[in-house]
Amino acid sequence: DLVPEEPPARLHGDLWNGNVLWGHDGRVWLVDPAAHGGHRETDLAMLALFGLPHLARVTAAYAEASPLADGWQDRVGLHQLHPLLVHACLFGGGYAARAAEAAAPYA
């Protein structure tokens, strides 16, 4: 199996750094959701894909609240594959090559 079996979680669905707003008061706001049920590693992979600042703090807090399965970091590329393919279709550029790199371990 590619990912550990667990019940679907409520996902933001479009959780990239542009949809994470950092308030002056230290609070964080998540905007523009495309909410759906899915594997909870997916939102974390999206944050990593587009370089969220303080990602290590975010993933540590997430894991503290709800521990992630062993090896979740190894599956980040798998969860990034779909958005990379979408971006390759929409924007071209290097997204197709990045999608191929993400898919290579699973070919």
Per-region residue spans from a language model:
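Hydrophobic alpha-helical segments that form the core
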Residues: G77-L85
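Hydrophobic, aromatic-enriched interface-forming segments
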Residues: D1-L2
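Short, well-ordered beta-to-alpha junction loops that form the rim of enzyme active sites
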Residues: G13-L15, L81
